[in-house]
Amino acid sequence: KAIRRQRQMCIRDSYGADLYHRINWLGNIDGFIDRNVEKQQNGYLGEQVIAPEKILQKVDEEHIIIVAMEKKAAEQVMRLLRTAGYIKALDCFYIEDFLDFYTYQQYAFFAADKLMISSVCMIPSTVCNLKCKDCLNFSPYFKKHIIHDFTFVKRDIDTLFRWIDYTPRFQVSGGEPLLNKDLGRTLVYLDENYRNRIESIETVINGSIVPGDELCRLMKEHRIKVYLDDYRENVPQLRETYTQTVEKLEKYGIEWIDNYVPEWFSLDVEHTEHSDMTDLQLENYFDNCGSPWNCLENERLYSCNFAHFAAKAGIIEETENDYFDLKDYSEVRKTELLEFLLKYTTKGYVDFCKKCAGWSEANCNKVKVAEQIE
């Protein structure tokens, strides 16, 4: 449904503090709703606190209400709001429905005049020290790896943030990021220049190299989140370095995520053939795939990062349909970028769909994790 421009938000509180910190970048939170009289008198997190009775007397057309409570209480509050005349998904939202990315993204643009992107993936270097048979970045296919210097990377970052106001995730990936000499410099640049517009600055490492002390110091100081892949089951030579990496991250107090998965899915580009699909079938295939990742490279945003990786590896030819060119900034074109981020490409799909088995749930080709090419 359409979202009315400039509607302020009120948060029905319980988990409200967490939600407040997540969405305060929008700049249009107008307060909390709570029965607590002390909060009503003193405010909360610097915002006004409104009594529920005031909201329930009549529909407040100046605000939308986000219900941020545990399930049973949230359902009760939503019933009261609907009885009072509020319309679910227009005037009031469960927290999980509001944060559903398409709703959140469109609200940010049309109500708060802010452009956000679900995530950003950047690969300054494709160099990797593993040869995974089903690598989603197609590293084994590269005849010559691509390495961008810091000047190139910095330009891409600065260009992106001319266009967008916020992203929940910015991940500097690879290849193996620890083989990139400018990894620390890139992470520090993101934190020092754009931290107020990025919720989580991340990197992902494969456990084959123990990060150095200086990099660990920087990652701790600049609040970098590390995703640590766990390939020990199928690459046993990583067991020692994996353990040492965990110890190092713990020693420096770095936030890290155990990125273990029991199986991979294969994009299976060598055996997938969808060229007989009609345009409509390919559009539906692209929509059902639903890959949420956006890749940034050479001042371009790619709607499917796997299509971009495949083009870099020489598997397919890249076309203008695959990306949005960020070089020539225009306020008017921000609406075009929003549409592109919502996966509206010129064709309605990317040509790589014809050779790809799809992302995650759409893909039934399960394979061993990090199985190495001999």
Positions of the model-derived regions?
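Conserved alpha-helical substructure of the radical SAM core
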Residues: D100-T203, V210-D213
